[in-house]
Amino acid sequence: MDFRAGLENVLQQEVTVIHGEETRKLCIANNKYLNGKDADTFRNLAVLLDHLGERSAKAQKLPKPVTSFIKFRNSDQSIFLLSDIPVKKFVILIYMFFRVLGFLKVGRKRLFVHDSKGVCVECIPLCILDFYIHESHQRKGYGKKLFDFMLKTENIQPSYLAIDLPSMKMIQFLHKHYHLINPIYSPNNFVVYSEFFNNLNNSNYSIVQSKLTTTNCFLKSNSSRIHQNKHNHSIVSNNNNNNNNNIIIIIIIQNITHHNNQLTIEQ
């Protein structure tokens, strides 16, 4: 994926980290009329992120991209861009073209995840949200290089991560390069590994609560009562005549399905 000049202020090394907060500031500045050079950078960055999101969605066979400039600038996520920075030619011609080889998007999300024993934990781990390496550069080590850079930057172990809707290729990638086995699927389509729960006290986690259960995850609510509908899913309605302020909402976990959406990566 080649991009013309206009990103030399952004892509200055092999792996560049872009944060949503910084992009928001650039967006605000753009509304206040940037100078020509900064405006060019802003526009090219928007085009780049939109294009990467579209390529990733196409590779995963998703109905729409999960990564776009507008979504990213309104988030607290980070994108790691892997690029092939060309050698400077003389002094005048600097970075005329950029080859972007792929990207990795991470961010923290509040999740309910279950271990193999049925323990339900609400936590805010770092998540792998999108991962794409251009088809012409897969199976050449670029995926691992990008992933390793992210791990070092975030100071985190692979087993501490939650992965959003990983494909079999992603599972194989984690097994091959990081020796992770026996993925644990949660109803929200996130996958974790057993080591995830062994390190819940690690500073990389923010634990909200933990409840022991088998097929149900129990939460507390105020002034509510439970009704079961014909599909066996729990629904909650208010009960003004109920003076009990501490009842339990039961969330029935049923019909867990695994989608075939894929994160395109290099193995």
UniProtKB/Swiss-Prot annotation:
Domain N-acetyltransferase intervals: 1-197
Site (Crucial for catalytic activity): Q60
Annotated SUPFAM superfamilies: Acyl-CoA N-acyltransferases (Nat) (SSF55729)
CDD domains: NAT_SF (cd04301)
Catalysed transformations (reactions): L-lysyl-[alpha-tubulin] + acetyl-CoA = N(6)-acetyl-L-lysyl-[alpha-tubulin] + CoA + H(+)
Documented EC number(s): 2.3.1.108
Keyword list, A-Z: Acyltransferase, Transferase
Binding site for acetyl-CoA: 131-144, 167-176
GO molecular function: tubulin N-acetyltransferase activity
Record keyword Transferase present: yes
One GO CC term, this protein: microtubule
InterPro entries in UniProt: Acyl_CoA_acyltransferase (IPR016181), Atat (IPR038746), GNAT_ATAT (IPR007965)
PROSITE patterns in the record: GNAT_ATAT (PS51730)
Pfam families documented for this protein: Acetyltransf_16
GO biological process: neuron development; regulation of microtubule cytoskeleton organization
Family designation: Belongs to the acetyltransferase ATAT1 family.
Free-text function comment from the UniProt entry: Specifically acetylates 'Lys-40' in alpha-tubulin on the lumenal side of microtubules. Promotes microtubule destabilization and accelerates microtubule dynamics; this activity may be independent of acetylation activity. Acetylates alpha-tubulin with a slow enzymatic rate, due to a catalytic site that is not optimized for acetyl transfer. Enters the microtubule through each end and diffuses quickly throughout the lumen of microtubules.
Protein name: Alpha-tubulin N-acetyltransferase
